[in-house]
Amino acid sequence: MTARKFETRRIGKTALEVTTLGLGCASLAGIFTGVPADQARATVGHALDKGLTYVDTAPQYGLGRSEHLVGDVLRERRAGVVLSTKVGRLLKPVPVAEQDKGAWVDPLPFNQVYDYSYDGIMRSFDDSLQRLGLNAVDIVYVHDIGAGTHGVEGNKPLWKQLETGGYKALRELRDGGVIKAIGLGVNEWEVLMDAFALGDWDVFLLAGRYTLLEQTSLDPFMTTCIKRGASVVVGGPFNSGILVGGATFNYAKAPEAIVAKVQALEAVCREFGVPLPAAALQFPLTHPAVCNVLPGPRSPAELDGILDWWDVKVPDELWTTLAAKGLLAPGTPIPSGMA
């Protein structure tokens, strides 16, 4: 099977380079609907066959299931792959009857405990290596810290853990050469601005906040990334489904205003003969801070569909028209300049 040639971009100031399209492995762990293990492993293998070099997983995904599945494949195919996982959640074994499964259909028999302390970060990292069955990963993200996940008051002690010990652990891992890059993986850009006050970071995985539909993170976050030399991986490029014909926006029923904006985006795309999902997938890379777009297919067939959208030629005039109609935030980078 011939691998595609993808553009690669550098992660921050590190020596790491990734293909501009990556593989997010949350869906493979069975969020909302189950994914057979063989299908999940086949999807990871198919991504590598097609030339993708960046794979992202996390302890939370299937409460350990995703890391096991990803490790099953990468133990035989580690060369040339940039792998990221996340820290901040420890998995504790529990009887299935007492388990909080969340949105996972068939998770492994654990509950998650948040811990962003020095010891918690180190334990989480070691646990991930064991689940993966690997002796190294390349990137470690602090996962889901922030008021959006924990509430304003609930986040305060957790942030204190990161501030007083967790960040030190990450720096030790990176500066000691154990890992190559550190960052945060979250759904809210505001906490990333707080993170800049702790020190330097290499890359942030931000889900759903810099998409064709929503550019709320544009300023000050994305502009600060440029100034600080940090890269951005854009997760959730379809805003959980609304940009691929679904009815959900950020995992909830889409409000009428969002539906109306999607219809307006789709009308412009139709004018240029471009499928809306193709424009949504390619849009984030118009920003110079973005190094990778990270969709989460559930099968090799879904990945092939994503690759078809990736191959669509999007004319510069489409972005210019979106900007002229006020469908992109002012200051959004587009090939012709700024919206």
What is the meaning of each model-derived region?
Residues 17-21, 51-53, 78-81, 134-138, ...:
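Short, well-ordered coil/turn segments that N-cap beta-strands
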Residues 82-86, 138-143, 231-238:
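Non-cysteine beta-strand/loop elements that form the S-adenosyl-L-methionine
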Residues 1-93:
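N-terminal binding-site loop/beta-alpha segment at the start of enzyme catalytic domains
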Residues 97-139:
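Active-site gating/metal-coordination segments in enzymes
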Residues 34-47, 117-131, 187-194:
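Short, acidic/polar
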Residues 5-10, 39, 60, 73, ...:
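Beta/alpha (TIM)-barrel catalytic core signal, keyed to glycine-rich beta->alpha loops juxtaposed to Asp/Glu
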Residues 4-14, 67-81, 121-136, 217-231:
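Short amphipathic alpha-helices and their capping/turn segments at secondary-structure boundaries
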Residues 13-31, 87-111, 141-150, 243:
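N-terminal small/glycine-rich loop or linker at the start of catalytic domains
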